[in-house]
From Swiss-Prot:
EC number: 1.1.5.4
Record organism: Xylella fastidiosa (strain 9a5c)
Cofactor or coenzyme needed: FAD
Region (Disordered), start-end ranges: 530-562
Full protein name: Probable malate:quinone oxidoreductase
Length: 562
């Protein structure tokens, strides 16, 4: 008996020591090579995705004499979440994503988030238009195409919600032209695949926004990166992984990188570092050791879609149709049937289906999640798991899905679909932010967030959606936070040439909305609708008589979707 107790005590002590070692690892900083440049470069960009490349494009125009170096661990640009196959490509503009417009307890629809995202996407259109005019992006149809955005629901409560959402949004210039209908014949004209084979007694409703787009962020990223390399002040290093970040007494940074082709390490000194490495950004932020890094953790979630390439199907679906998550499901489960342009051909994708993975990147390590856990965030991560049990249950359920289960979900949006029509494809990884709140402790936070050190010498972008589609706006925020003096000393004036609406809210003025959209629509070969001075709304298609219902809450309480 005593021997058993002694053995048990020994096991407990060993487990406790192993846990402490795990949470406090590494116990000391390893030695790294000294920087091989006495004069620091101006900026180091980590990660070859759309965020780093967008920031580099801004900086190259604002300060062409600055020396910029970009390090990417893979052998090409935009191979992770920025690649067209690894994201939804929606051009998130809040036209269709119902989780951006929750229903409040009093029955009204909150539209502030939707307006903000719509304005951010207009900034993206301005930025891309500027790059097209200056030859940094190819013909617009290679990366952005007119693709109407739809919201599609069934059931009286959800129809009533969608009606109220439509009424709230169309009072705003950015949403002028959005149509609402409960008429199956009208909805079938908009999206035949949604309606064919559907029972006639099912009550349905949809909104239709002709100004929606499909965006290939991989094309944008690769072409902008190609043009960055035309400058002798820019250097791109592929197959180079950042392994250490150390701040010097003079506030510069030594960035240690490993050449993955020969295994050699070297360090480069930089005045400013941007970590735009997608899912890997959290671990790199932790490598920096800045105090702000202790307030964050991350939870990875992968995504899968059903892919349709048969032209008999793809030629009959030219919209992005977003539904609403089932009651009790997390917002990342919002289903959508999307028309896409990928690899030069039309594709239809349906999903997402969550994929449990401990990787932070699609081409990452299974140990990514575990290596991000430390004594600063371990307890908080456990607390977040306990407080988000619906998400945990959802992921567990998704892990057990069969092809028959996925097809059953598909039939809700494409009633005539056959199992032989589609193949299952794996998209990119996303890492949800877990952040320390001053009052609530660690919480699960949706969206993206810029984390910056107090010296404004290192910045990291954490989070996911809406992400790529609002990258020019996000990087504008970063410029303002990281380089306030340069902004005052001339950058703001230059930015108004790149982003004509800079410093203004597009949605505040029909005249400004028309001016900006007319310009970007012409440059990007996209449809344009003139907003009347008083934002008068166009006549709705046939609408069934309004039913009275008690208020119901939008199933998507958090503002996030894959």
């Amino acid at each position: 008996m005593k021997k058993s107790l002694k053995d048990l005590t020994g096991l407990i002590v060993a487990f406790a020591l192993a846990t402490l070692l795990f949470l406090y690892w590494p116990l000391y900083q390893r030695s790294v090579p000294k920087a091989n440049n006495d004069t620091p470069v101006d900026v180091v960009l980590i990660g070859g995705g759309i965020m780093s490349v967008t920031l580099g494009t801004y900086l190259q125009e604002l300060q062409p004499d600055w020396k910029i170096e970009l390090f990417e661990r893979l052998n090409g640009i935009a191979q992770e979440s920025s690649d067209g196959w690894n994201n939804a490509g929606t051009g998130h503009s809040a036209f269709a994503e119902l989780n951006y417009t929750p229903e409040l307890q009093d029955g009204t629809i909150e539209i502030k988030r939707a307006i903000k995202i719509a304005e951010q996407f207009e900034i993206s259109r301005e930025f891309w238009s500027h790059q097209v005019r200056h030859g940094r992006l190819p013909a617009p149809t290679e990366f952005i195409n007119a693709t109407p955005h739809m919201s599609f629901v069934w059931g009286e409560d959800r129809i009533e919600y969608l009606r109220k959402r439509h009424n709230a949004l169309i009072k705003n210039p950015l949403f002028y032209g959005m149509q609402f209908s409960t008429d199956p014949a009208v909805i079938q004209q908009w999206a035949p695949l949604l309606m064919e084979g559907r029972t006639q007694d099912q009550k349905i409703a949809a909104t239709y926004m002709p100004l929606g787009t499909d965006v290939n962020f991989g094309v944008i990223t690769r072409d902008l990166a190609k043009h960055l390399q035309y400058s002798q002040n820019f250097a791109l290093h592929l197959d180079h992984e950042v392994t250490a970040l150390r701040q010097n007494p003079d506030k510069t940074w030594n960035v240690t990188v490993k050449n993955l082709n020969n295994g050699q390490e070297r360090s480069i000194k930089s005045r400013f570092v941007f970590i735009g490495a997608g899912g890997a950004a959290l671990k790199l932020l932790q490598l920096s050791g800045i105090p702000e890094s202790k307030d964050y953790a991350g939870f990875p979630v992968g995504g899968q879609f059903l892919s349709f390439e048969n032209t008999a199907i793809t030629k009959r679906h030219n919209v992005k149709a977003y539904g609403m998550a089932e009651s009790g499901s997390p917002p990342m489960s919002v289903p959508h049937l999307d028309a896409r342009k990928l690899d030069g051909k039309s594709i239809v994708l349906f999903g997402p289906f969550a994929l449990y993975s401990t990787k932070f990147l699609k081409k990452g390590s299974w140990f990514d999640l575990y290596s991000s856990v430390n004594h600063h965030n371990a307890a908080g991560m456990l607390s977040v798991g306990k407080n988000n049990i619906d998400l945990v249950k959802y992921l567990m359920k998704q892990a057990t899905l069969t092809d028959a289960d996925r097809h059953a979900e598909l039939l809700k949006y494409f009633p005539n679909a056959k199992p032989t029509d589609w193949t299952l494809v794996t998209a990119g990884q996303r890492v949800q932010i877990i952040k320390r709140d001053p009052e609530k402790g660690m919480i699960l936070q949706f969206g993206t967030e810029i984390v910056m050190d107090k010296d404004h010498t290192l910045a990291t972008l954490l989070g996911a959606s809406p992400g790529a589609s609002t990258s020019p706006s996000i990087m504008l925020d970063l410029l303002a936070k990281a380089f306030p003096q340069q902004m005052k000393n001339g950058w703001e004036t230059q930015l108004k040439k790149i982003i004509p609406s800079y410093g203004q809210h597009i949605n505040d003025s029909p005249a400004l909305t028309n001016k900006i959209r007319r310009m970007t629509s012409e440059t990007l070969s996209l449809p344009y609708l003139e907003v009347p001075d008083k934002s008068a709304t166009p006549p709705d298609p046939t609408i069934a008589p309004k039913h009275q219902h008690s208020p119901t809450h939008n199933a998507n309480s958090e503002m996030q979707a894959l």
